[in-house]
Amino acid sequence: MKKLIYYFGSNGSDGNASMKNVLGNKGAGLAEMSNLKLPIPDGFTITTELCNYFYTHNNNFPKNFQNDLKKAITELEITTGKIFGSTSNPLLLSVRSGSTVSMPGMMDTILNLGMNNEVCNALTDSCGDKRFALDSYKRFLEMYGTTVLSIPSDLFEQIYEKHKIQADIHKDSDITVELLEKIIDDFKWLHIKYTKQLINDPYEQLESAIKAVLHSWMSNRAVIYRKINNISEGFGTAINIQAMVFGNLGKTSATGVAFTRSPSTGEKKLFGEFLINAQGEDIVSGTRTPMPIIANDSNSMQAMMPEVFKELSQIAKKLEEHYLDMQDIEFTIENNKLYILQTRTAKRTAIAAINIAVQMVEEKLISKEQALMRIDPESLNQLLHTRIDYSKGLTSIAEGLPASPGAATGIAVFSPYDAEKLSHHHKVILVRHDTSPEDINGMHVSSGILTIRGGMTSHAAVVARGMGKPCVCGTSNLSIDEKKQILTAGDIVIKQGDIITIDGGSGKIFLGEMPLIQPTFSEESKLILDWADEISSLKVRANAETVNDALVSIKFGAQGIGLCRSEHMFFDKNKIPLVREMIIAPDIERRKLAVQKLLPLQMEDFKALFRVMKDKPVNIRLLDPPLHEFLPTTEEDKKNLANSLNLPLSMINQRLHAMHEVNPMLGHRGCRLGICSPEIYQMQIEAIFTAIFELHKKEHIECNLELMMPLISNVGEIKKLKMDIYEVIEELEQRYRYKFSFMLGTMIELPRAALGSKKIAKEVDYFSFGTNDLTQTTYGISRDDIASFLPYYLEEKIFESDPFTTLDEEGVGELIEIALKRGKSSNANLKLGACGEHAGNPASIEFFHRMNLNYVSCSPYRIPIARIASAQAKIKHG
């Protein structure tokens, strides 16, 4: 068996920062801080190896583990000068989880372990403060009871509140020694009621606590968190056992969390909060609203504890310069002595990540490549958060702490269950006293989070920032009744289902729906995206059909349009009647008449698009979807169509019935339409090329056209369509006495097209892989119907991910690789692109880079994500 226990503390450490897979994120940090000679409580880390052994051996420990554990405790007793379980000089322990990947609040912690009546009395004698000793005992009974014995936490809360009410006490700090003794007696009774015993033996407490932490690795909340954040279950958790240091030892003791820069904005100054006379869980749980570390008022640590603040500032600077990244630091102050409990790379908003990365490049701490690799591409969604338009003279009903930026409007809900249930049909704002790890699913589906208690480093704030959701915490001027499902702000009562708006940037709360403004990129955001473009070889284009789409795409840095779905232009209310006439017309003459009516409308659409894009490439796909998408379904629409064609309604119904397809997505669509009804594609070709000519002649705009044929399955279809297309173009060239320049390409979205790509490539200038349909036709799964069984497939690990979100490299990816190799073998100059949902997915973009594609094309709002992902792929793979 590998070594299971590593020491750290004032005498150095057995480990270091590189050992995260063995020691976990927290343990590796403690080891490294020991090596840096920073003030940390002595302790040891039990490696992730124990967790993996535990789960593969029926929840049992290895043979000699108990002996190794006792040896480790003995070493700790020697370095601290205290004895575990002693009735004269007791050593108390903290037992904390520590995954290899940070999972804040998702797993269990037990503080003050080793407590019993005798130890409590000894602690009183050694420190001379009975209230402190009793408070520590009370905390242990509650934490051990909920974490190890699975006693519902609200039962402890009820006992605590009952005694406070009976004694007419409102502040925790006013609780007397006598009242604490009564609360402890009731907590003990609760232990005995649930487990038939009170565990007083310190070693029995320790072993059961270790097992509880190991069990928490597979707790529901931890499993959900890993699933949401794509963290492997195979990592396991380490366990960190340390000598307790006490932040609840009076007015010269405290606990807190500090960030070396702002996790919301990235501003370069120490940021964080602390609580005097408290333990760590008080600040993280959000049950008390903390005070700032640095501020201009007398309640800040800077003002109240200037010497400790100075030392903390120096340590924060040292840690950031050592790790070359922003740090999240947990600390405790015991009688004015500072101890660092943990440091880790801090979670941050997207804008903070960008600002910090740019700052650190400018400070010459890291390179541009390192800066880019620190940006989570998906987190850039946060840059697209809306904000409230305050120019409208709005009045808020309450204000709290701005815990996570962005504005959100939705109906108020008061439980995670209701959030999940109602989010299917509404945007929801989850309103709670404070959130806990059990709320993770409800938080995930909510548009925003509002808590009455807690600060900027509470569970709600940290998780919301990680998810990129707006959050307001610490709204002390609001009151909530979760059972009655009402929120009160003065005379205003908000019930479940009422619409509210929260602003996570200012902390303001509003009744009703507020006007919102779309965000703009900061200069730092533009700069880091420019760095991405400098490095990446895979260009990023947009899927766009409208002028608005094109403008948004250019704003976000698109290098062209990689997919213009021309049929989207047909769904305009002025065009759809003409499209229906074209489809339903019983003879060629009437069809041509409808086509001619559509021609000028489609031409204006293309002109508007080309005008915005100027000389950037615009890849237009000819009409693709099945005709049923355009056909009338209501009686009113059918009657209107009959009138416009001057046909009886019965004939319209006959035509509709004749055109019915059992499986339209694999039926009369794409190039099959263009071959069987050539006048449709002829009209589109004339509209496109006439638009190009008129822009050239009248506005001196030189368009960069790429023309694409959809749903090709064999080279015969290509040859037929090419003949028809060039016939129209040649006629237009003669009419306008102008030579058109363009590229002709095809979608590769059917397996047969991929396999037959050698012949197809000879006929075209480029391939664009339509990965949506290629995935559908490879799997034989409809993208619209996969939701009915996908959750089960993911849960059973039949699929590792949704194949319509992340490209299946083994199946669909192999077809793409076959197609590009065979295509290039017959056409060395063949250009390659990809469009569809996968083109905006970072993991899929990495695959496209490895395949040496020229570009990807995604929705406008995925462009920043794709630009960063493209650069990261280049940095990783060259």
Swiss-Prot record:
Substrate binds at R565, R621, E749, G770, T771, N772, D773. Keywords: ATP-binding, Kinase, Magnesium, Metal-binding, Nucleotide-binding, Phosphoprotein, Transferase. Residues 503-537 are annotated as: Linker 2. The active site is at H459 (tele-phosphohistidine intermediate), C835 (proton donor). It comes from Rickettsia felis (strain ATCC VR-1525 / URRWXCal2). The modification Phosphothreonine is found at T457. GO terms for molecular function: ATP binding; kinase activity; metal ion binding; pyruvate, phosphate dikinase activity. Activated by light-induced dephosphorylation. Inhibited by dark-induced phosphorylation. Both reactions are catalyzed by PDRP1. Its EC number is 2.7.9.1. The N-terminal domain contains the ATP/Pi active site, the central domain the pyrophosphate/phosphate carrier histidine, and the C-terminal domain the pyruvate active site. The reaction takes place in three steps, each mediated by a carrier histidine residue located on the surface of the central domain. The two first partial reactions are catalyzed at an active site located on the N-terminal domain, and the third partial reaction is catalyzed at an active site located on the C-terminal domain. For catalytic turnover, the central domain swivels from the concave surface of the N-terminal domain to that of the C-terminal domain. Homodimer. Residues 348-404 are annotated as: Linker 1. Residues 538-878 are annotated as: C-terminal. This is Pyruvate, phosphate dikinase. Phosphorylation of Thr-457 in the dark inactivates the enzyme. Dephosphorylation upon light stimulation reactivates the enzyme. Residues 405-502 are annotated as: Central. Its cofactor is Mg(2+). Catalyzes the reversible phosphorylation of pyruvate and phosphate. Transmembrane segments: none annotated. ATP binds at R96. Mg(2+) binds at E749, D773. Belongs to the PEP-utilizing enzyme family. Residues 1-347 are annotated as: N-terminal. The lineage of its organism: Bacteria, Pseudomonadati, Pseudomonadota, Alphaproteobacteria, Rickettsiales. It is an enzyme of class 2 (transferase). It catalyses: pyruvate + phosphate + ATP = phosphoenolpyruvate + AMP + diphosphate + H(+).
